[in-house]
Amino acid sequence: MPAAIQITECPRDAMQGLHQFIPTELKAAYINLLLQVGFDTIDFGSFVSAKAIPQMQDTADVLQKLDLSNSKSKLLAIVANYRGAEAAAQHPEITYLGFPFSISETFQQRNANSGIDKAFETVKNIYALCDQKNKKLRIYLSMGFGNPYGDEWSVDILLKWADQLVELGVEDMYIADTIGIATPGQITQIMNQLKGYKNIRFGMHLHSTPDTCLEKIEAAYSGSCRLFDTALKGYGGCPMAKDELTGNIATENLIGYLQLQNESLTLNYDKLREAMDFSVRIFG
């Protein structure tokens, strides 16, 4: 497990569920502010079907408006199939391709119109493409803590797919609490199991209500997780969650917790406040 804290800020996840289209210039202005904060990575957009996620149809245009000249942050784009991966891989500015791989058969079918086995074949092809194009592949193990469909779930099932991905060569995986149902006990249990993997970067993409945010952060951190996905003010998250208050882990809550643990964070807090103020123009 990495020793240093690495935060991936996720404006893509925050924005993608909004029904009203956010102008390209406004998206780019917000992300440009985030690029100055000092996050390790920015999950800035996705190369997916415009029909599936209309909000992200301008990702390539947004990318052209980003100023990376004075930013240490890397860019990540989400892809859902090989075609999207090809489109993303054409852009030298992008470091990571992120692929959501569901360990729930039902969710995988609904999300990508293919079963888990077929999705794994897609991962193989995207991994080869990343190797060819000098990109890094990040796998999100969706429904990593259970699912609402009655599909079988266990830590063993999660680890089975993690093992297969490691055998393929994947070195970067985030466990995704897609519908916000993870308990602190589950998080601790899974983190303890993941400690057995050597030279693999495991992170957490957690969703929560405001009331459960800190306990989930604490469980992950106490279990040696140092890689976190977050979004300012907890925007975005879980359209399928039963509780409409369920969203992404709020970046400012994670930062506050880490400061209490005396973690050294090399962030520009003035730019962070500026980005938080600006976010109202997008999210209201």
Question: What does each model-found stretch correspond to?
Answer:
Residues 1-284:
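Catalytic cores and adjacent flexible loops of soluble metabolic enzymes
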